[in-house]
C-alpha cells in the first residue's frame, strides 16, 4: 500500500519532507496511523481507539479510490484524536493568543526536521504541549496553511503561528544537539511533565 497521497500537500520540492520520506520511515500506512495517534495523544492504548483503519474498505476498491482512502484515514485519525483533546487545545490557544506576534513565518518541516521528529518523538512529545503537537502535524507535516489549521482547530491564526514556532524551536534544539536544554521548561507554556520524566529515565 502506497503513501504517495497520504497527505494531499506532501509533494517533494527538495525543501520539505515528502511522501517518500514518510514511506521510507514507516513502511506502510498502518504504522503512520499508529504513530500519528500515539504522538498526538501520548497514550498508546488510548490512541488505538482513534485510529481509523481503511484497510478492509480499500481491499474491495480500485487504485484511485485506494489512494484517496489512505489520505482520508490519516485525516480522520487526526480529527478523532483532536476531538478527545479539543478542550485542552482551546484552553492552550487562549494562552498562545496573548503572546507577541511571530516575526518570521515558519515553513513546513524539512526532511531533516522530519527525521529528527520520528527518531526523537518521545522527547518531542514530552517537550510540546498538545496544541503544539497538533499544529506540528497539520502545519508541519500535512503542510496545511496557517489559516486552514486555525479553522480545523477552531483557534486563531496567531495561536497557530506561536504554537508552530515552539514546535520548530524544539526541533532546532535537537538539530543543534541541545538535548538537555530541550528537557527544560520553556516560555511558561504547559507541557506534559510525566512524559518528560519518562523520557529522561
Region spans (language model):
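Short amphipathic alpha helix immediately N-terminal
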Residues: 125-148
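Pre-recognition alpha-helix immediately N-terminal to the DNA-recognition helix
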Residues: 21, 32, 123, 133-134
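Short amphipathic alpha-helical boundary/capping segments
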Residues: 10-13, 109-113, 119-129, 156
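A short, charge-rich alpha-helical start-of-domain segment used by transcription regulators
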Residues: 2-35, 45, 59, 64
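DNA-recognition helix of helix-turn-helix
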Residues: 147-189
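Σ70-family region 2.3-2.4 aromatic/basic alpha-helix that recognizes the −10 promoter
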Residues: 30, 48-101, 164, 168
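Internal acidic/polar
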Residues: 88-115, 188-196
Amino acid at each position: 500500500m502506497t503513501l504517495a497521497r497520504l497527505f494531499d500537500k506532501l509533494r517533494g520540492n527538495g525543501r520539505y519532507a515528502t511522501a517518500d520520506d514518510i514511506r521510507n520511515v514507516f513502511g506502510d500506512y498502518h504504522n503512520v496511523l499508529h504513530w500519528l495517534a500515539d504522538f498526538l495523544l501520548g497514550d498508546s492504548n488510548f490512541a488505538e481507539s482513534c485510529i481509523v483503519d481503511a484497510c478492509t474498505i480499500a481491499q474491495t476498491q480500485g487504485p484511485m479510490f485506494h489512494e484517496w482512502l489512505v489520505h482520508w484515514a490519516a485525516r480522520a485519525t487526526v480529527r478523532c484524536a483532536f476531538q478527545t483533546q479539543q478542550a485542552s487545545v482551546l484552553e492552550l490557544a487562549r494562552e498562545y493568543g496573548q503572546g507577541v506576534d511571530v516575526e518570521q513565518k515558519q515553513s513546513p518541516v524539512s526532511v531533516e526536521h522530519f527525521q529528527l521528529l520520528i527518531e526523537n518523538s518521545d522527547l518531542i512529545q514530552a517537550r510540546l504541549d498538545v496544541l503544539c503537537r497538533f499544529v506540528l502535524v497539520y502545519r508541519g507535516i500535512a503542510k496545511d496553511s496557517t489559516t486552514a489549521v486555525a479553522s480545523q482547530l477552531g483557534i486563531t491564526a496567531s495561536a497557530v503561528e506561536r504554537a508552530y514556532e515552539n514546535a520548530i524551536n524544539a526541533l532546532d534544539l535537537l538539530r543543534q544537539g541541545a538535548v538537555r536544554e530541550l528537557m527544560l521548561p520553556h516560555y511558561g507554556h504547559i507541557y506534559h511533565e510525566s512524559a518528560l520524566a519518562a523520557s529522561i529515565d
